[in-house]
Amino acid sequence: MECVKQLCRNHLRLDNLTDPVRSVLTKGTTAEKVQLAACCLGVVCSIICLALGIAAAAVGVSCGGFALGLGIIAILLGIVLFATSALDVLENHGLVGCPFKLPCKSSPANEPAVQFFKGKNGSADQVILVTQ
């Protein structure tokens, strides 16, 4: 339980979110500022569209269930894409992601290297294949 409390203290602070946003606004490039603003606007618009879609379905507007389901999936996908794009900008400015990230990159394959050792007259005297 102490581990969970420590994790919450270290990673769930408001400063962990506000500091990267402040960094983007003060030190970020124009492209990063535009991307962050567009992402925030996209998330807000997607949430509004989702709420309107649910309200329309509740009222009983003539909309097929399949079309409504596809619309909700598309809007949720939009929220996820906008949010991940915003997080991408913020991670460049110090936002710490989830502490439980799985390693995405596999270790590089050990490729053999060839080393040439020259002899006295400049010809290849010895060739060694080195694996790491």
From Swiss-Prot:
Q: Where in the cell is it found?
A: Secreted; Host vacuole, Host pathogen-containing vacuole, Host pathogen-containing vacuole membrane
So which domain of life are we looking at? Bacteria
Induction comment: Cotranscribed with incD, incF and incG within 2 hours after internalization.
Could you state one GO cellular component term attached to this entry?
host cell membrane
Q: Which organism is it from?
A: Chlamydia trachomatis serovar L2 (strain ATCC VR-902B / DSM 19102 / 434/Bu)
Q: What is its main location?
A: secreted
- Keywords assigned: Host membrane, Membrane, Secreted, Transmembrane, Transmembrane helix, Virulence
What's this protein's name? Inclusion membrane protein E
Q: Does the keyword Membrane apply?
A: yes
A Pfam family annotated for this chain is IncE
Q: Which InterPro entries is this protein grouped with? A: IncE
Q: What biological function has been recorded for the protein in this entry?
A: Inclusion membrane protein probably involved in early modification events of the chlamydial inclusion.
| TM region positions | 41-61, 66-86
Q: How does it sit in the membrane?
A: Multi-pass membrane protein
